[in-house]
């Protein structure tokens, strides 16, 4: 029987209706120099100057954004399937003007603890938690802990068509439990419709090492701001409040496979939507002016 290689099966759920796409691979050869298998990502995005507003009298203008991501997971095999053990770090830095009623930094440092298993030749399952600290700074970590988790699966209709189903749970979210669905469809030898959130896209494979794509990236996460954030910004309801940050990026890019273990990605596009939502305090700043962005990343499996 052909063995499914779960390390290539990527299924992450980060926000409402945001379910990442699975990939499928043949059985890989053993690595004689590094006995463990795994995956990694190093990514940097710059978003140009944009605007948000709460109402016509309250707005934040002309601020840029840096989004930095590091991700490293090892995938040792055990009898039930493949463990996923690792860590992630993401930092969103905003070039806000002095006195802005928004945090200038949002960051998450979390573990990745999960299991990939295969119920049958056609059904693949992932359970994964991301326990860690999600906040606007590391001043007080004791009550900034959160542990969102996902349960998802893929049904393989054929080598060219897969259905992705799952549910995300995050107690800090406005709607704690959210389901999602998506498909991956290889429409032609060089064309793939990867209609699975958070990165739905249409791909064109130029050759084995080069892929062009156009699509979107939908990001959402929940953070705790500082204990005195509300006092400093004139609204005590925002002290240690939960902030849901959302943004949508649309663009086009290129995946260039430099080696079997390294893929370089470059992407440019436009950010049409961004929102800072203190939903429990009923304070929301939404997009009032989009911005261009550019992304570069190195990623791979080993």
What are these regions (language model features)?
Residues 50-52, 59, 92-98, 198-272, ...:
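Outer-membrane beta-barrel translocator/channel fold
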Residues 74-78, 117-123, 155-159, 171, ...:
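Outer-membrane beta-barrel strand-turn architecture
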Residues 59-63, 103-105, 137-143, 168-177, ...:
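Solvent-exposed loop/turn segments connecting transmembrane beta-strands
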Residues 64-72, 107-113, 129-133, 147-151, ...:
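Hydrophobic, lipid-facing positions within transmembrane beta-strands of outer-membrane proteins
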Residues 181-184, 190, 254-260, 286-302:
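Outer-membrane beta-barrel "beta-signal"
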Residues 44-50, 78, 87-95, 131-137, ...:
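Transmembrane beta-strands of outer-membrane beta-barrel pores
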Residues 78-84, 121-127, 160-165, 190-193, ...:
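Repeated loop/turn-to-beta-strand initiation elements of outer-membrane beta-barrel proteins
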Residues 26-122, 130-139, 146, 242-244, ...:
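Transmembrane beta-barrel domains of bacterial outer-membrane proteins
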